[in-house]
Design a protein with these regions (language model features):
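Eukaryotic intrinsically disordered and solvent-exposed regulatory patches
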Residues: 12-17, 143, 149-152, 182-189, ...
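A short acidic-Thr-Gly-centered motif at the start of a beta-strand
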Residues: 9-28
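Glycine/proline-rich, flexible active-site/cofactor-binding loop segments
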Residues: 1-6
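Conserved polymerase palm-domain catalytic core
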Residues: 22-174, 192-197, 205
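Active-site and adjacent loop segments of nucleotide-processing enzymes
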Residues: 55, 113-127, 131, 135, ...
């Protein structure tokens, strides 16, 4: 049964969807844990952290498995008995550090205790807190010998505060059973057949096949966004193009990974290229950067089965 709903990043989520999603989907739902940084009770966060740390050191039968966690130069590892390392930590050491962290990074606003979102540890603390409830929910069902319901969560994912659930149209009915009452969960599904999650737009076709393409919240705004430099600005031209090569390649990689159809990929590439041309970038320089992108990452666009020359023509056809 699938009880780890947390992808490492949006790329991990996309790869999981593309490799393991069901051949036919009958529902697609998304939810948002709104303002959850400001609503996580510190007492519950400490309790859940203590339990998770304890489980890391124990076997399933309740016997101790490890004595220390050792921080090495290039890796961390558990040891069962003794270590002469000066950077070894017992279970109590780790929890005491976590407790100190929780007690000293909070902020007060309007009488509420908040976890500051800008700290490095905030997403990790929130992730482990929510994971503990998700795992407890699935384990609780299995202990009751229920198999059908937990199986319906096999295609459920949560990236920080965004939840995606495939083939489980009744996920919303279980929300109150999974998460603590302090959290506010909103259904953010666009339609019965489409929705957006993280930086992906997902859509079901008439045969239940799941398609993906790149999604950017800024596209929904009714005013233009300036997110790349203008060549006419007071900066040296050579560094500007150097930055562009990096930006262009990285963006095209993201588009090729996210866009299941060639047309969606071209639309995104054309939008980016047009934007940069309008900001003073030279056409010949952009084409050169595109060739570099294809040369290094051709495997990502080979699946479209379109020759590079045709892709270049399609992306630059308005120039």
């Amino acid at each position: 049964m699938h009880q780890m709903w947390i992808p490492k990043n949006s790329k991990d989520l996309l790869e999981f969807i593309q490799s393991r999603s069901p051949s036919s989907c009958n529902s697609i739902k998304t939810f948002d844990l709104s303002t959850f940084y400001t609503t996580i009770p510190h007492s519950k966060l400490k309790d859940k952290s203590r339990v998770l740390v304890h489980l890391c050191f124990m076997k399933k039968n309740g016997l101790r498995r490890y004595k220390y966690l050792v921080l090495g130069r290039d890796r961390s590892y558990f040891v069962k008995h003794y270590s002469d390392s000066t950077k070894k930590f017992a279970e109590t050491d780790i929890f005491n550090m976590l407790e100190f962290l929780i007690d000293n990074i909070f902020a007060m606003f309007d009488g509420r205790v908040l976890i500051p979102m800008g700290t490095n540890c905030a997403p990790l603390l929130a992730d482990q807190f929510l994971y503990s409830y998700e795992a407890d929910f699935i384990q609780g069902l299995l202990k009751k010998n229920e198999k059908k319901l937990p199986r319906s969560f096999n295609f459920t994912f949560r990236y920080i505060d965004d939840i995606l659930s495939l083939n489980n149209s009744r996920f919303g009915d279980s929300v109150d059973r999974i998460y603590p009452i302090e959290l506010e969960i909103k259904d953010t599904t666009d339609t019965d057949r489409s929705t957006s999650c993280v930086d992906l737009h997902l859509e079901l076709d008439s045969e239940g096949r799941l398609g993906t393409k790149r999604y950017d919240k800024r596209d929904d705004l009714n005013f233009p966004i300036v997110n790349f430099q203008f060549i006419c600005s007071i900066i040296p031209a050579a560094p500007a193009y150097g930055v562009y090569i990096y930006i262009y390649i990285s963006q095209m990689i993201r588009y090729s990974r996210a866009c299941g159809s060639y047309q969606d990929f071209i639309d995104r590439g054309l939008q980016l290229t047009t934007k940069l041309l309008n900001q003073g970038f030279y056409l010949v320089k952009l084409k050169s950067s595109l060739r570099i992108c294809y040369g290094r990452h051709h495997d990502l666009v080979d699946r479209y089965e379109i020759y590079m020359s045709q892709q270049t023509t399609d992306i630059f056809h308005l120039s």
